[in-house]
């Protein structure tokens, strides 16, 4: 087969990469680790950085560099929007560690609206985004079956976050609410919306009914894809249910799963190091504080396989459904 033309500079860049990789491999195992694991990681980092330099010189893509970086993208989430100036400073600071941020939609168990209307501002700053919808939770209680009148009163109250609202019917209704809110914020079709499911020692069937119906409704509607934020303690069971819903809907994709667990966390690890191959995001530091650009924020720290966890894998030509037609 004929070889594609390669510019002389590209050939020299490739030779440089190969040369450095060869030197690193020649060093073999080192005292940094009995099996050379740390050394091999450093070799990969060096080679990836060289590939980036070569890409900049030649104008070509650097898949090795991209693969090395895309699997370990640090991000953070915090309850209340920190403000435009803070977000700009955190993104522009030299050596700024975070590439993406959680974007909270108004939802039953997160009624704060401080993030509303900030999508384009954050995108313009260069932030990746993870859309979060905090649905109904158990809060350590066993859900009770309510009358239609009592259910309506809870839904219309100023505090519509209640374990007794964990039903399939409420899951569908909250899914429509999530679709409408995501569309209103201007997120493109097939963006992933992460349903926040907090830790449960024992998961009641009512919770499975709720998130199952929520997931099914998003898949059925088709404008956005369902993802899930879940604690490691419940992750396998939730993943199995959500994966089954994808299969039943004929959606040949892996659901995006965001797993929370502080155990074994170190910056530099990949999401899958939380203990599940299906984990695409890992929240490893919870209720902490970090300082960037001399500005301190309360936050959780995460690592993601994607620079922007809610971005669809492939650009879509699906038309955006206006919010007033979401239920159709």
PLM segments and residue spans:
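Functionally critical loop-and-helix segments that line ligand-binding/catalytic clefts
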Residues: 50-82, 87-88, 242-328
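Substrate-binding cleft of extracellular glycoside hydrolase catalytic domains
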Residues: 57-210, 220
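C-terminal region of N-terminal signal peptides and the immediate post-cleavage residues
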Residues: 24-50, 54-58
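Aromatic-lined carbohydrate-recognition surfaces of secreted/lumenal glycan-active proteins
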Residues: 219-240
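Glycine-rich, charge-decorated loop segments at or immediately adjacent to ligand/cofactor-binding or catalytic sites
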Residues: 139-146, 234-246
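Secretory targeting and sorting signals
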Residues: 3-31
């Amino acid at each position: 087969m004929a070889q594609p033309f390669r510019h002389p500079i590209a050939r020299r860049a490739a030779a440089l990469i190969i040369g450095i990789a060869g030197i690193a491999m020649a060093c073999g195992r080192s005292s940094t680790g009995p099996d050379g694991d740390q050394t091999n990681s450093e070799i990969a980092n060096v080679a990836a950085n060289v590939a980036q330099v070569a890409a900049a010189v030649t104008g070509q893509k650097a898949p090795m560099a991209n693969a090395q970086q895309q699997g370990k993208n640090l991000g953070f989430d915090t309850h209340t929007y920190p403000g435009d100036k803070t977000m700009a400073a955190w993104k522009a600071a030299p050596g700024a560690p975070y590439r993406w941020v959680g974007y909270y939609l108004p939802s039953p168990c997160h009624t704060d609206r401080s993030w509303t209307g900030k999508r384009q501002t954050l995108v313009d700053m260069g932030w990746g985004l993870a859309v979060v919808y905090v649905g109904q939770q158990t809060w350590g209680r066993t859900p009770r079956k309510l009358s239609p009148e009592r259910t309506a009163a809870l839904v219309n109250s100023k505090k519509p976050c209640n374990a007794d609202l964990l039903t399939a019917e409420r899951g569908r209704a909250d899914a429509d609410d999530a679709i409408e809110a995501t569309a209103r914020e201007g997120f493109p079709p097939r963006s992933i919306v992460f349903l926040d499911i907090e830790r449960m020692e024992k998961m009641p069937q009512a919770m499975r009914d709720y998130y199952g119906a929520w997931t099914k409704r998003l898949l059925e509607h088709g404008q956005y894809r369902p993802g899930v934020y879940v604690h490691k303690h419940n992750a396998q069971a939730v993943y199995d249910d959500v994966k089954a819903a994808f299969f039943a809907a004929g959606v040949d994709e892996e659901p995006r799963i965001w797993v929370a667990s502080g155990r074994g966390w170190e910056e530099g690890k990949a999401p899958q190091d939380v203990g599940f191959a299906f984990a695409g995001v890992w929240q490893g530091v919870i209720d902490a504080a970090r300082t960037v650009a001399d500005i301190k924020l309360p936050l959780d720290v995460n690592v993601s396989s994607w620079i922007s966890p809610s971005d669809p894998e492939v650009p879509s030509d699906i038309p955006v459904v206006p919010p007033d037609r979401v239920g159709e």
